[in-house]
């Protein structure tokens, strides 16, 4: 647990467990805190959960570990001796508590996925090597996790592996959802997509989003009355066109 020096008594709510370690150090914000937390990570993969985020159930880590091991074994068979294991991001779906619905991630990460909507960091398990050269770029106040995901895909050539399961529960009403930060998010999104996709491709995708009524679809996805219906349709579309690693294979 990385704490920035909270005084609201939240640390006292942690259960007594020898596996929990608390590191307290001042930080300048969410992404700076996450960068600091990386210095304490000792495993092969890392996931970030922020205030209000929870693993969906007690079996998430066990099921994901099984998928990771199968993928590692298959990769080892194909990569041969002397080759480093491929850097990967394993990701799944998110349950949005405020909307009362599952937010399904795209089963395939391509250029359009990277423009439109990548998986949120709460449902991603990153190979720690993807943070070896650099962490989150804190100049991005709202979109640093988005920028880092594109860095992993385009600069580090990481493989994104979709696992069909709900990984994390998101409380809703978070940092990125305020009106001011939504405006900042749009500006940062334009800068980041131009950098990784190029101006022409980013413009084509922006026009495509407008032609397919993206603003209306966003309102449907965020409306408590229609969110479950909309995301259910999206899940069916994803199921027909994507590939996945099943946790129960």
Indicate where each model-derived feature is located.
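Nucleotide-sugar donor-binding/catalytic module of glycosyltransferases
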Residues: 1-178
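Catalytic core of nucleotide-sugar-dependent glycosyltransferases
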Residues: 165-166, 178-204
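Membrane-proximal basic amphipathic "stem/tether" segments
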Residues: 194-249
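Solvent-exposed, non-transmembrane amphipathic alpha-helical segments
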Residues: 57, 146, 150-151, 183, ...
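Weak global preference for isoleucine
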Residues: 20-22, 30, 89, 103, ...
């Amino acid at each position: 647990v990385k704490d920035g020096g909270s005084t609201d008594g939240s640390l006292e709510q942690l259960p007594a467990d020898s596996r929990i370690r608390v590191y307290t150090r001042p930080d300048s914000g969410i992404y700076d805190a996450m960068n600091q937390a990386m210095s304490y990570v000792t495993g092969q993969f890392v996931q970030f959960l922020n205030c209000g985020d929870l693993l969906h159930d007690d079996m998430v880590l066990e099921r994901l570990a099984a998928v990771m091991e199968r993928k590692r074994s298959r990769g080892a068979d194909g990569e041969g001796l002397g080759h480093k294991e491929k850097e990967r991001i394993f990701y799944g779906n998110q349950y949005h508590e405020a909307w009362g619905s599952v937010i399904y991630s795209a089963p395939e990460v391509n250029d359009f996925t990277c423009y439109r909507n990548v998986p949120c960091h709460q449902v991603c398990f990153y190979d720690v090597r993807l943070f070896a050269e650099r962490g989150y770029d804190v100049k991005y106040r709202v979109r640093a996790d988005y920028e880092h995901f594109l860095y992993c895909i385009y600069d580090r050539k990481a493989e994104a592996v979709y696992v069909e399961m709900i990984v994390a529960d998101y409380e809703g009403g978070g940092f990125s959802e305020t009106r001011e930060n939504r405006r900042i998010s749009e500006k940062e999104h334009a800068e980041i997509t131009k950098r990784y996709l190029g101006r022409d491709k980013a413009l084509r995708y922006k026009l495509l989003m407008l032609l397919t009524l993206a603003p209306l679809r966003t309102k449907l996805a965020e409306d408590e009355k229609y969110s479950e219906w909309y995301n259910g349709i999206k899940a069916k579309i994803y199921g027909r066109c994507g590939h996945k690693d099943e946790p129960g294979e």
